[in-house]
């Protein structure tokens, strides 16, 4: 029971993968695939469901292979490993191809990706609303794989190629649009992809225009800054020259020197100015002092005189001490 044994091995490789035993899973899945391709005729005769079960074996073992390669850090080798193990691109199940390519692209590696996808498109032909293998380009090994694809499976590969490789990696939206327009695709699906590509192109164009506008704005600002700096330099130079030709000022920071005999005194002009102002104020106050004293004396004298007059007036008023007990004389009628 060759098929039963292979399924048991596939389940064991899946267990390794679940347990994160990636090296064991990779080794066993690769061995299973080689064993399958070494016994194609026997498996085709023993499989109760024919090629359908054969395809399921390839798909299950292939999924373990690509995920285990990713787990052990060999993601960049996935496409090349698929070619080596399966031999023919036609023999690689679509889901295995998609998963492997996506894992490799997500790791930032496009090594062999474009070549394997373009070879995939060459061997599948659109006919009667589905895709079939082009027998002229497929060997006996590939012919035993699934030889018919529905539209949804094929379109998944188309979208990965147009958006993930041409539009993103090659950064050529025009090439992606041109390829879709010429590819053998159902018209409704073609128009859907073209609309998405044109939308992306519009967004990219708008983004580029915005970046160019920002660059232009930055250039204008930088030019203005440079002009401003030049003007500031000119102003600084002018100020320096004006300081050099500045007339003598009492408030200047340069010190004044005075030599008396063998002794030399040095004092800043600011201190000299403050001292002169102080002397002027003292002189003015001294001259005003006598006048101020006279004014104050006159005011004090007038105040004292007013107080004395008030008291004299108060005590000069005669009061009769018997007025309180004398009766008021009555009038006669």
Curated annotation (Swiss-Prot):
The chain crosses the membrane at residues 91-102, 269-285. Disruption phenotype: Embryo lethality, when homozygous. This is Protein APEM9. Residues 1-90, 286-333 are cytoplasmic. InterPro entries: APEM9. It is a multi-pass membrane protein. Interacts with PEX6 and PEX19-1, but not with PEX1. Interacts (via N-terminus) with PEX13, and (via N-terminus and C-terminus) with PEX16. Keywords: Membrane, Peroxisome, Transmembrane, Transmembrane helix. The lineage of its organism: Eukaryota, Viridiplantae, Streptophyta, Embryophyta, Tracheophyta. Involved in peroxisome biogenesis and matrix protein import. Required for pollen maturation and in vivo germination via its role in peroxisomal function, which partially involves jasmonic acid biosynthesis. Transported to peroxisomes via the interaction with PEX19-1. Required for peroxisomal protein import by acting as an anchoring protein for the AAA ATPase complex, which consists of PEX1 and PEX6. Residues 103-268 are peroxisomal. One of its GO terms (biological process) is peroxisomal transport. Expressed in roots, leaves, stems, flowers, buds and fruits. It is found in: Peroxisome membrane. One of its GO terms (cellular component) is nucleolus.
